[in-house]
Amino acid sequence: MLTRKQHELLLFIHERLKETGIPPSFDEMKEALDLASKSGIHRLITALEERGFIRRLPNRARALEVLRLPDSIAPGLSPQKKFAPSVIEGSLGKVASVQPVRPAPAPQNSEAPATVSVPVMGRIAAGVPISAIQNQTHMLSLPPEMIGAGEHYALEVKGDSMIDAGIFDGDTIIIKRGDTANPGEIVVALVDEEEATLKRFRREGASIALEAANPAYETRIFGPDRVHVQGKLVGLIRRY
């Protein structure tokens, strides 16, 4: 599990190596992560090396090699630099009452729509569960290929419990509405009919586990009648 800064630095090094074949300098890494001193970069590199994500090559200046990336990182994903979240305000209530908009099918023999409108329903906790969304705030226009078929809605992420899955506070996530999920999928889960959270779905025997992607948060176990899946993650939007 990586912290947000470790995650950002690993991506920055990976992208620089992919683009130029040369690792970034400590000054470049410090600037990219907006840190005050290079000592912070030294600590992050040591932590990444201890966790087996990178290694320092002997007898070569600035020599770093990326050994692996977290499973959640798709190839080509760019690191955050001075990230400024796009905050989407929303009122709070039950997810269960959300009525997402289903895009109307295009008429036969006509061109497919350039965009699909998806309702933004407010906020969802990626941390300790909070009361979840009820009222639509506005619409997002998205390319159809981003979401595919089905009913969808969007939420603003609040919290840091999913950072090792590449989901950060302030991100906007796209959820495909549904009441089932496979183990390992990231879902919007309604707990006790009143609290919603964004977590990875697991099964522990007859119980349901809601698993964070941040070692600072414990996996929470519930009886099957206490958790209702409200949809699963299919996309993410981040503004820089």
Swiss-Prot record:
Example GO biological process: negative regulation of DNA-templated transcription
Name of the protein this chain belongs to: LexA repressor
Molecular-function GO term, any one: serine-type endopeptidase activity
Source organism, top-level taxon: Bacteria
Catalysed reaction, written as an equation: Hydrolysis of Ala-|-Gly bond in repressor LexA
Keyword Cell cycle recorded: no
Family of the protein in this entry: Belongs to the peptidase S24 family.
HAMAP family xref list: LexA (MF_00015)
Taxonomic source organism: Brucella melitensis biotype 1 (strain ATCC 23456 / CCUG 17765 / NCTC 10094 / 16M)
DNA-binding region: 26-46
Enzyme class at the top of the EC tree: hydrolase
UniProt KW keywords: Autocatalytic cleavage, DNA damage, DNA repair, DNA replication, DNA-binding, Hydrolase, Repressor, SOS response, Transcription, Transcription regulation
Quaternary organization: Homodimer.
Any Pfam family hit: LexA_DNA_bind
InterPro entries from the UniProt entry: LexA, LexA-like, LexA/Signal_pep-like_sf, LexA_DNA-bd_dom, LexA_repressor, Peptidase_S24_LexA, Peptidase_S24_S26A/B/C, WH-like_DNA-bd_sf
EC number: 3.4.21.88
Cleavage (site feature) positions: 126-127
